[in-house]
From Swiss-Prot:
Cited InterPro entries: 4Fe4S_Fe-S-bd, 4Fe4S_Fe_S_CS, NADH_quinone_OxRdtase_chainI
Protein name stated in the entry: NADH-quinone oxidoreductase subunit I
Keyword annotations of the record: 4Fe-4S, Cell inner membrane, Cell membrane, Iron, Iron-sulfur, Membrane, Metal-binding, NAD, Quinone, Repeat, Translocase, Ubiquinone
Keyword flag Iron-sulfur: yes
Gene behind this protein: nuoI
Subunit structure: NDH-1 is composed of 14 different subunits. Subunits NuoA, H, J, K, L, M, N constitute the membrane sector of the complex.
Residues annotated as transmembrane: none
Pfam family of the protein (one): Fer4_7
NCBIfam families cross-referenced by the UniProt entry: NuoI, PRK05888.1-4, PRK05888.1-5
Residues annotated to bind [4Fe-4S] cluster 2: 73, 103, 106, 109
Catalytic activity: a quinone + NADH + 5 H(+)(in) = a quinol + NAD(+) + 4 H(+)(out)
Subcellular location: Cell inner membrane
GO cellular component: plasma membrane
Boundaries of every 4Fe-4S ferredoxin-type domain copy: 53-83, 94-123
Amino acid sequence: MTALRDYVKSFLLVELLQGLRLTGKHFLSRSVTLEYPEEKTPKSPRFRGMHALRRYPNGEERCIACKLCEAVCPALAITIEAGPREDDGTRRTTLYEIDMFKCIYCGFCEESCPVDSIVETREHEYHMEHREERVFDKARLLANGDKYEAQIAADRAADAPYR
């Protein structure tokens, strides 16, 4: 009896019609994919993208050269050298570099920073034309921080209840 039923199902193409019905149902529904460069998905305030160093409102850089971000980095992408300041003798960074080819964007550096100096912005569309550009130095990181400070502050404010 089952052999006869299987023969009738295959003769009437029941499985094919069931598959066509399912395909037709999804064919008429709204598209899930986006055309990436033209359409972009919204990003979370916790998105981890390009790194930046922040400044205080008076223009002084926040980094106190504690080297916690360098110590906690699992990819060993951060290099810091510290030295005393000329005016008040406090410790500040003389060299702050992040090798973006090594970075895995884990966010540990951001979490470990006691003064919220190193942050990751929402910017993920950046490129490098030469291999030497992969190392972001202190000047470039500070420039990123100045450029995205409004967005960084808004993201920090939105995320504050969860910290």
